[in-house]
């Protein structure tokens, strides 16, 4: 599934990490740029997991940070806490495409 949206970036301290356990997430900016953060540590949930959306949000320590812009993409692995849509200096709204790629449960069992 792909979702295209216009996003107003927020500062890192206002954003929570998110984690999807049954999906890979691939993001690319169509217009504008943003910062992102990834945690290699444990996610501490701030509310119950939304099983239907395969989404857990919470806090974690930042291990890696980077910048996403037109022509580049970021791939977040299943189970990997990340923040995206973070404000980059001098950048306003951005248009982005988010691809949600469902994992094959049978493949994981093997």
Kindly give the residue locations of the regions a language model identified.
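A generic local secondary-structure boundary/capping motif
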Residues: 16, 87-89
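Short, conserved beta-strand element in jelly-roll/cupin
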Residues: 21-35, 40-42, 49-58, 67, ...
